Design a protein with these regions (language model features):
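Boundary/entry segment of secreted carbohydrate-active catalytic domains
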Residues: 20-55, 213, 294-316, 325-329, ...
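Well-ordered, non-membrane alpha-helical segments in soluble/globular domains
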Residues: 29-34, 61-70, 134-138, 161-172
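N-terminal membrane-targeting/anchoring modules of bacterial envelope and secretion proteins
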Residues: 73-78, 100-106, 168-172, 225-227, ...
Length: 373
């Protein structure tokens, strides 16, 4: 076989191997920069990351930073902060390399099949089954531990197959006395509550909340504390002397405010703020307790939208719902590339054997002619 023929055969054989690199031409889900995304943020949803469609994050670390950049170019992560902090990985163990890449990109929460992760990453577990019809488990959600976060799995499509949601379970969840939240909101609400302290001077209690988060994209999530004391409350004001919003106890979405509870008050306030509680009488004894769950509700629920490549398709069944979602955004394949890849693969399957046979026959004819001469 001649040198040029050998090179051509090698090139033909390599074509199918090299062809998948076309998939690097990624698409953009423009719904992320539409009114749909804005509405979901207003409801309280969070946008996290899950890498690039068809790419295993554990094998290709570059998708971690790339997914963050892709998401930030389209929308902010939450009403509480710009940068995404939640990352979905379909792996039980996150090694040090992946962990370092996640932390370097600002991610702080991983889930929801993860069982082991390096220090600096919090794990959100899948403990609420799914919203898929036939898989949803009301009893599992109902048996959740007090003050825990229940993560319910949701994926609108698997390939071209549309997944049906369980409308009865959705309606049931909406009726429960639970806090509708997200991975990031739940995580930072706890942290803000822990970093809140209270002091008393005569008949005035000062409640101060500090923030551990810094930077332009950092999340600033309110925290909740219960402050116990004996005297009755005259009023609750912010640092500017304005009355704090009064909560009724029926709110299920995180909001700043306060309400009376047995033996004191429950206050939810923004980080880096001060709240003043004026009492009828003086006191020198108070007790402060951070509350893990907003409004002192039973437990918390978030619906986790996995492999979200098209926000419209993933949200279309939940218009008007009170549920709050943690959307794990995945950058999709370019639609044009989607149909080109199978066509290219089929062409190679047909063309390569035919070309090799043709070239071999051409070599045989050439060798035969040389022998005759």
């Amino acid at each position: 076989m001649g040198k040029s023929t050998s090179l051509l055969v090698t090139a033909l054989i390599c074509l199918p191997i090299l062809a998948p690199t076309v998939a690097a031409d990624w698409g953009t889900d423009t719904w992320l920069s539409s009114v749909i995304a804005e509405e979901r943020l207003d409801i309280g949803d969070e946008f996290g990351c899950q890498g690039f469609e068809g790419v295993e994050t554990t094998d290709e670390q570059w998708v971690i930073a790339a997914c963050k950049e892709y998401l930030e170019d389209q929308t902010k992560a939450s009403r509480w902060g710009k940068s995404p902090i939640s990352f979905g990985i379909d792996s039980k163990v996150i090694d040090e390399g992946i962990g370092d890449a996640l932390i370097k990109s600002g991610f702080q929460i991983v889930g929801d099949l993860v069982e082991e992760a390096p220090e600096g990453l919090s794990i959100a577990i899948r403990n609420g089954a799914s919203l898929e019809k036939g898989v949803a488990d009301k009893n599992l959600i109902e048996s959740a531990e007090e003050d825990s976060l229940v993560s319910v799995h949701w994926r609108a499509r698997i390939g071209d197959l549309r997944v049906r949601e369980d409308k009865d379970v959705i309606s049931w969840i909406e009726e429960q006395p639970v806090w509708f939240t997200t991975w990031g909101e739940w995580h930072f609400h706890r942290a803000s509550g822990i970093s809140t302290s209270a002091s008393v001077d005569g008949s005035t209690i000062t409640i101060e909340s500090t923030s551990q988060q810094i930077g332009s994209g950092a999340w600033q999530v309110p925290g909740t504390v219960m402050v116990e004391f004996e005297p009755s409350v005259v009023g609750v004001t912010d640092a500017e002397g304005l009355p704090m919003p009064l909560l009724t106890g029926s709110e299920r979405n995180l909001a700043v405010g306060w309400r009376n509870v047995d033996g004191g008050v429950m206050v939810t306030q923004n980080p880096n703020t001060s709240v003043y509680v004026e009492l009828e009488d003086t006191t020198n004894q108070i007790e402060t307790t951070p509350l893990p769950t907003f409004n002192d509700l039973n437990y918390s629920v978030t619906i986790v939208g996995h492999h979200t490549t098209n926000l419209f398709r993933w949200t279309q069944d939940f218009s008007g719902t009170e549920l709050v979602f943690t959307w794990l955004i995945e950058r999709p394949f370019n639609d044009e590339v989607g149909w080109k890849l199978p066509l290219l693969a089929m062409t190679m399957l047909i063309a390569v054997p035919i070309s090799i046979v043709y070239l071999l026959r051409a070599d045989q004819i050439s060798a035969s002619n040389n022998q005759e001469h």
